[in-house]
Amino acid sequence: MEIYEGKAKKMIPLDEDKFIMEFKDDATAFDGVKKAKFVGKGWLNAQISAKLFKLLEDHGIKTHFIGVAGGNRLIVERLEMYPIEVVVRNVVAGSLKKRLPLPEGYELPEPIVELYYKSDELHDPMINYYHARILGISEEEIKEMERIALKVNEILKKFFREKGIILVDFKLEFGKNKKGEIVLADEISPDTCRFWDVETKKSLDKDVFRFDKGDLIEAYKELYKRLIGEEPQI
């Protein structure tokens, strides 16, 4: 069975219904132009993702998460993946600064949901419902992904606020299971989210690497400690 490898993870077939999702220590930014390797990053992302998937499952969100296979590996359900990313934004940051006349850090009165087509070659362009239909994704499917994404946002915002963290924005991916249900997939980690400390607005995510803001592993360890309540064993 074929192993699928991306920039940050490997998907290793376990059987007809499951994959091992292995998180790598590699970090990339700006469409792969900036690259580095950080020992322990894969372990931290796997453990943080597992914690957040469990939290969401406890709140009734269907995810592909099955269990932890140890270290930097999770066991996940095999899905038919949609070729889009759903981004939810609570605070102005990143590319949103270029599209709205609002300062960085401005707290939005309501979340913004955006759709992006997954394509390295096209640099993940933003799309809308019309584009999605051309890609074979119905309006009903998009609306269900948006509904789930907003529910995820509601759960995670509250959880992170209690840990002294602002959930600035995040990216989700979805797939369809054998029952035809739309299921949350991929990962939820500091690689795919923006997290700021409530008091200092210090980044606790991949922006630390992207913009040379400090030590990436120390930022990820700090996030882990706040979420899990103990020192990471790496």
Curated annotation (Swiss-Prot):
GO molecular function, one term: phosphoribosylaminoimidazolesuccinocarboxamide synthase activity
Keyword Transmembrane: no
Record flagged with keyword Cell inner membrane: no
Pfam families membership: SAICAR_synt
Enzyme Commission code: 6.3.2.6
Classification via Gene3D superfamilies: ATP-grasp fold, B domain (3.30.470.20), Phosphorylase Kinase, domain 1 (3.30.200.20)
Metabolic or biological pathway: Purine metabolism; IMP biosynthesis via de novo pathway; 5-amino-1-(5-phospho-D-ribosyl)imidazole-4-carboxamide from 5-amino-1-(5-phospho-D-ribosyl)imidazole-4-carboxylate: step 1/2
GO biological process: 'de novo' IMP biosynthetic process; cobalamin biosynthetic process
Membrane-spanning residues: none
Keywords: ATP-binding, Ligase, Nucleotide-binding, Purine biosynthesis
Record field: catalytic activity: 5-amino-1-(5-phospho-D-ribosyl)imidazole-4-carboxylate + L-aspartate + ATP = (2S)-2-[5-amino-1-(5-phospho-beta-D-ribosyl)imidazole-4-carboxamido]succinate + ADP + phosphate + 2 H(+)
Superkingdom of this protein's organism: Archaea
Family: Belongs to the SAICAR synthetase family.
Name of protein: Phosphoribosylaminoimidazole-succinocarboxamide synthase
Organism in which the protein naturally occurs: Pyrococcus furiosus (strain ATCC 43587 / DSM 3638 / JCM 8422 / Vc1)
Gene giving rise to this polypeptide: purC
